[in-house]
UniProtKB/Swiss-Prot annotation:
SMART domains: PX. It comes from Colletotrichum higginsianum (strain IMI 349063). GO terms for molecular function: phosphatidylinositol binding. Keywords: Autophagy, Cytoplasm, Endosome, Lipid droplet, Lipid-binding, Membrane, Mitochondrion, Transport. Pfam families: PX. The lineage of its organism: Eukaryota, Fungi, Dikarya, Ascomycota, Pezizomycotina. GO terms for cellular component: cytosol; early endosome; endosome membrane; lipid droplet; mitochondrial membrane; mitochondrion; phagophore assembly site membrane. A 1,2-diacyl-sn-glycero-3-phospho-(1D-myo-inositol-3-phosphate) binds at R101, T103, K127, R146. It is a peripheral membrane protein. This is Sorting nexin-4. Sorting nexin, involved in the separation or division of vacuoles throughout the entire life cycle of the cells. Involved in retrieval of late-Golgi SNAREs from post-Golgi endosomes to the trans-Golgi network, for cytoplasm to vacuole transport (Cvt), and autophagy of large cargos including mitophagy, pexophagy and glycophagy. Required for the switch to necrotrophic growth. GO terms for biological process: endocytic recycling; mitophagy; piecemeal microautophagy of the nucleus; protein transport; reticulophagy. It comes from the Eukaryota. Residues 1-10 have a biased composition (Basic and acidic residues).
Length: 478
């Protein structure tokens, strides 16, 4: 059943971070009403979302420069440069730079998930979700996409009021001897796993049984969160398809422009009389193709990846909601079992046979006791004493489960508010970056072709075939 030993409960030793969470982030509300008010603030809420805007410590991380290391050996891997600017007093310097590989990020994620079970820890990019990338896992397409995803992972951690203060995160961002930290924590983790191994089977049994049990009373707040998360996933999936189609078309147009420029270059040998005009025209087309390449890299490599990463983050929130529901199911199952034992005890006290059972089952039990020569009164007292012991134990367990469930509810409400705030900041940043790339592309294309027109007009005014007026193309190549 759902009777859970105190030492086997994964959340029995959890620090619920009530004071720390509230002090760390005032925008994290504890009620759905306050959270809705935060959402309705609209654009004004963005100002308070920025790190350090409310006077708290700044933690700004930048992931860049993927580097292939140990090339040519079986231990080849890619490391990423992490540059951190912070005002946290726990850091030795305000700016630090370290290199970390993907397995280091995995270790950090697992450590945070273990240390903060009541938090929706942002997920890492899944290795199996990179099949759409051309080339191998050491190619620039793959490593640049992963760098963008790792950047979003650290951004989410830096915006979370509790996770941003985690010691393991600070060590990850600064320590020059990270491998030693991983080894020491792995040893401690394996030791604690051995200590608690006796309860593994019981926990698995409880989880398996409760997996088929649903909560009887549903909290409207979390039902609404689940519905909104499902709607978010649906919308993101639609947007992802459209953006992927846009990226493919940008790539096709880029290839068409390159082919067009190549064909005009071939035309020069056939029409030497317009060599200068054709060369400038071909160069302008080629520069436009380079601009499309940059635009496609932002659309496909960064923005499209952000949509997939947000879907994964939404899934992490749903997992937390499921864990919250599991805590509620545990409490309801314990309460149901307690009520059953209470009814059995009351039936015994009312004198409904030594078994405490009524109906056909009670009569059958009494006949069996008669055949065995059991003293009915002694059997009744023994069963009543056993039921009293069970009731006392179940009462304690039910009260503890209720407290755990209520605390978990409060933490999940805070996590939902944090998720919405982080999502809002990320959407604003990603959409802003996409808009900036579009503006930059069209500004540069306008400059390229205006330069070409001016160059051609100047040639027409001079009446000679100038060879020195180069339109401001080629700038995109730089």
């Amino acid at each position: 059943m759902a009777v859970i030993d105190q030492h086997q409960d994964d959340f029995s030793n959890v620090s619920w971070n009530t004071d720390e969470h509230t002090a760390a982030e005032s925008s994290s509300s504890v009620t759905a009403t306050e959270f809705d008010d935060t959402e309705r603030n609209g654009h004004n809420a963005y100002e308070s979302d920025a790190p350090g805007s409310d006077g708290q410590e700044v933690l700004d991380c930048v992931v860049s420069e993927p580097l292939k290391e140990n090339d040519g050996s079986k231990d080849t891997f890619v490391s990423y440069l992490i540059t951190t600017n912070t005002t946290f007093p726990s850091f030795q310097r305000s700016q630090t730079t370290v290199r970390r590989r993907f397995t280091d990020f995995v270790f950090l994620y697992k450590a945070l998930s273990r240390d903060y079970p009541t938090a929706a820890v942002p997920p890492l990019p899944d290795k199996q979700r990179m099949e759409y990338v051309s080339g191998n896992r050491f190619g620039p397409d793959f490593t640049n996409r992963r760098a963008h995803s790792l950047q979003r992972f650290l951004n989410r951690l830096s915006l979370h009021p509790v996770l941003r203060r985690a010691d393991i995160l600070h060590i990850f961002l600064e320590s020059p001897d990270w491998n030693a930290t991983m080894r020491s924590r792995s040893v401690r983790g394996s030791t604690s796993s051995d200590t608690g191994s006796s309860g593994v089977f019981d926990n698995l049994t409880d989880s398996f049984l409760n997996a088929f049990t649903k909560a009887h009373k549903h909290d409207k707040r979390f039902l609404e969160v689940r519905e909104r998360s499902d709607k978010l996933d649906e919308d993101l999936a639609h947007i992802e398809k459209v953006v992927a189609r846009v990226a493919r078309r940008e790539n096709d147009i880029e290839l068409d422009f390159k082919d067009l420029a190549e064909q005009f270059q071939k035309l020069i040998t056939l029409e030497p009389g317009v060599e200068n005009e054709v060369r400038h025209f071909a160069n302008s087309i080629e520069d436009t193709a380079m601009g499309l390449r940059k635009l496609k890299d932002v659309t496909d490599g960064d923005y499209l990846g952000s949509l997939r990463d947000m879907q994964a983050y939404s899934t992490a929130l749903k997992s937390l909601l499921k864990a919250r529901e599991q805590k509620q199911v545990d409490y309801e199952q314990l309460t149901e079992y307690l009520n059953k034992n209470t009814v059995d005890r009351d039936q015994l006290q009312s004198g409904q046979g030594s078994s405490g059972l009524s109906g056909a089952s009670g009569r059958l039990m009494r006949k069996l006791e008669d055949v065995r020569g059991v003293d009915h009164e002694q059997a009744r007292r023994d069963r009543q004493r056993k039921l009293e012991m069970n009731i006392d134990k179940l009462t304690t367990e039910a009260e503890r489960a209720k407290k755990t469930s209520e605390m978990f509810d409060d933490e999940v409400v805070k996590e939902v508010a944090d998720f919405e705030r982080i999502k809002r900041v990320e959407f604003k940043k990603q959409l802003g970056g996409l808009a900036d790339s579009q503006i930059e592309f069209y500004d540069e294309v306008t400059e390229i072709w205006e330069g070409y027109v001016k160059a051609m007009e100047k040639e027409g005014v001079s009446g000679t075939r100038s060879t020195g007026v180069e339109p401001p193309g080629r700038r995109l190549a730089d």
